[in-house]
Amino acid sequence: MLFQDLSFPAAIGAVFGAVAISVAARCIYDLFFHPLRNFPGPKRAAIWSFYEFYYDVIRDGTYLWEIEKMHQKYGPIVRINSRSLHIHDPEYFNTIYAGSGRKVNKELSAVSGYTFPHSTISTLDHDLHRKRRAIVSPYFSKRAIAEIEPVIHERLNVLISRLAEAKGSIVDLTSAFSAYTADVVTYHFYGTHANYIGSKDFKYGLKDALTVLLNLYNLTRFLPVPANTLKNLPLPILGLINPNFPLVVSAREANKKMVLGYLNKPDEDKKAMKDARSKSVIVSALTDPNVPDAEKTLDRLLDEGETIIFAGIDTTARTLGVALFHLLNNKDVLMKLRKELQAVAKPDGQQWTTTELEAVPYMRGVVQEAIRLAYGLVVRIPRISPHEALRYNGFVIPPGTPVSQSTYLVNNDPSVFPNPQVFDPERWVKAAQDGVSLDKYMVSFSKGSRGCLGINLAYAKLYLGIARVATSLDMELFETTAKAISVYHTRGFAFPKEGDGAVKARVMGLCK
């Protein structure tokens, strides 16, 4: 009855007034009554997530630099939005990203941008995540990855051959490495690959779809419902909204075809596949009687496959690009790497194993430096201690508080890595000789019970890929400077201020 007596303008005014009162009340609560009210940080950042939204959505993934400024002004622990804290302290990283001894949940906003709600990486609850991870983790053990090294070498044979054929031409090494990593990771998950290395100019739809998702990451993190709705719209409508959106759906349909291709096989064929080769994740999971039926649904398999594939493609490809940039940009480093690898050269017809390359100190230094300066996920991935209060620097962090650190800030901390922007494999060699474990501070794969599932596969692709490409081909950088691989925008992964971070080179030919 109250609103019936109001004119339309008055009713609109009443609604806006109610909204204004609600917003004001929320601001007052966040500033003066919230459990985090006494933590350091600018007051504007403590009000909802407006400040974060402005820098990550409006200004395209630049909140990291504001957080860095906060630490410079307020110290190692700061409140970065109404309910979250950020800490910059390499020694405290393992406390936030804890192992199996303490429960850690994920924050909803941290996984909303993935748009794969049924995947392990998007699972919020600690216990459900542990169960889901246990299903697939055996297929990513060092032993399991060692068994697919022949496939990795076969793909590298094709990659090196294609690059050699481009003698005198300019190639996009990042795209080439993306095709290589895509072939390996899809083969491991599905038991087959699409020969992305054979695609023209190393361009393929799956990579384009990933680029679309990354460009949308910051928006979908704040607005997940519209993003998930888009996936279900017809392709023509998606194309009208954005010409690149259909690429995402097409990639999902291609993955769906692979899954259904196995699900629809006769039982005899499934058994033959399992008996012949049970190394692929999907074949192994679907034929494992210990895996609950609820974990074998089409949505689960699609989401799981897509997150493993997308995560396994771009991070490794970018790291390979960073490695080759620095090797080609500093020929002394390249020559030293070749010399050390020549000392452990294999007879004709034989290839290095990952284990053999890991034992070469300088090779290990090159790989670790590439990983450090590629950063992995550069966005904040908060962890929540649901029941236990954390203590840091005199502060008691209430249970249920999202707390995070930045891989970029840790990897560039001069107290751990002097001259952090310098690509210096010797820092790892010297640290090992001095009995210092820099691995403790290698956080590009995150840490703890939710650390990167595919770390062993990533290392295999990196060791074998860097060693073979660096010793097989002579190349020169083409119109690629350090700015091309620098970090300015954080869209899940690191992006430079301009361009897509591609490393380009002119192929001079095979090494003599």
Swiss-Prot record:
Subcellular localization is given as:
Membrane
Q: CDD domains given for it?
A: CYP58-like (cd11062)
| Family that this chain belongs to | Belongs to the cytochrome P450 family.
Q: What does this protein do?
A: Cytochrome P450 monooxygenase; part of the gene cluster that mediates the biosynthesis of the sesquiterpenoid aspterric acid (AA), an inhibitor of dihydroxy-acid dehydratase (DHAD) effective as an herbicide. AstB catalyzes the second step within the pathway and converts (-)-daucane produced by the terpene cyclase astA into an alpha-epoxy carboxylate intermediate which is further converted into the tricyclic aspterric acid by the cytochrome P450 monooxygenase astC.
EC number(s) per UniProt?
1.-.-.-
Entry GO CC: membrane
Needed cofactors, names only, are: heme
Topology with regard to the membrane?
A: Single-pass membrane protein
The record's GO molecular-function terms, alphabetically, read:
heme binding; iron ion binding; monooxygenase activity; oxidoreductase activity, acting on paired donors, with incorporation or reduction of molecular oxygen
Under the heading SUPFAM superfamilies, the entry gives:
Cytochrome P450
Q: How is it used?
A: The fungal sesquiterpenoid aspterric acid (AA) is a submicromolar inhibitor of dihydroxy-acid dehydratase (DHAD) in plants and is effective as an herbicide in spray applications.
Q: What class of enzyme is it?
A: oxidoreductase
Q: What is this protein called?
A: Cytochrome P450 monooxygenase astB
UniProt pathway? Secondary metabolite biosynthesis; terpenoid biosynthesis
Q: Which residues bind heme?
A: C452
Enumerate the UniProt keywords alphabetically. Answer: Heme, Iron, Membrane, Metal-binding, Monooxygenase, Oxidoreductase, Transmembrane, Transmembrane helix
